[in-house]
Amino acid sequence: MQVILLERVAKLGQMGDVVDVKSGYARNFLLPQSKALVASDANIAQFEAQKAQLEARNLETKQEAEALAVKLDGQQFVVIRSASDAGALYGSVTPRDAAEAATEAGFSVDKKQIALIAPIKDLGLHTVAVRLHPEVEVSINLNIARSPEEAELQASGKSIQELAAEEEAAAEFEIAELFDDLGGAASDDDDQAPASDETA
């Protein structure tokens, strides 16, 4: 099916391009979201008549997106989730969670604008792309943690695995010291034990 693009569509074309797409993609995505018109003679004439208006609207939305991009780019948002000791999440962090975290911080971001390749399934810092406009994309950082305190530690540069290793090393050190103390006490007891009379 041939359609006329009313705005830039990633991997498809620029505004005004007449492109061939699968009919399902046109009917289910491009046409309902007003991203394209069916390429008939009447629609081509209508597009040409409205082209200046569409370009002005596109420029306005792009400028709004660029203004938001300046504020949003590089921001870090904390998402609190339950996770195992190894750092694997019980569930996952989805585009909806990322959009909600950004919205709570005062940014207007929709879940459709979040570009996750795959759901996030482990604790730590994750970089996520946000497409504010077909021509404006920024990156945000999601700090996935079990608690606000853990999020602060991660933000300072420590990973959950490093923290767990430090805690484990400290516990092993305490156990080793305890055994050393017990071992020293046992050898003191051996030294103080009365010598048995071997001549009897």
Curated annotation (Swiss-Prot):
- InterPro entries associated with the record: Ribosomal_bL9, Ribosomal_bL9/RNase_H1_N, Ribosomal_bL9_bac/chp, Ribosomal_bL9_C, Ribosomal_bL9_C_sf, Ribosomal_bL9_N, Ribosomal_bL9_N_sf
Which residues, if any, are the signal sequence? Answer: none
The keyword Ribonucleoprotein is annotated on this UniProt entry: yes
* Gene3D superfamilies reported in the protein's UniProt record: Ribosomal protein L9, C-terminal domain, Ribosomal protein L9, N-terminal domain
Which keywords describe this protein according to UniProt?
Ribonucleoprotein, Ribosomal protein, RNA-binding, rRNA-binding
Q: Which GO terms describe its biological process?
A: translation
Which Pfam families does the protein's record reference? Ribosomal_L9_C (PF03948), Ribosomal_L9_N (PF01281)
Q: Does the keyword Transcription regulation apply?
A: no
Q: Name the GO cellular-component terms.
A: ribonucleoprotein complex; ribosome
Family membership: Belongs to the bacterial ribosomal protein bL9 family.
Instruction: Report the function annotation for this chain.
Output: Binds to the 23S rRNA.
HAMAP family the record matches = Ribosomal_bL9 (MF_00503)
NCBIfam families attached to this UniProt entry: L9
Protein's name in the database: Large ribosomal subunit protein bL9
Lineage summary: Bacteria, Pseudomonadati, Pseudomonadota, Alphaproteobacteria, Rhodobacterales
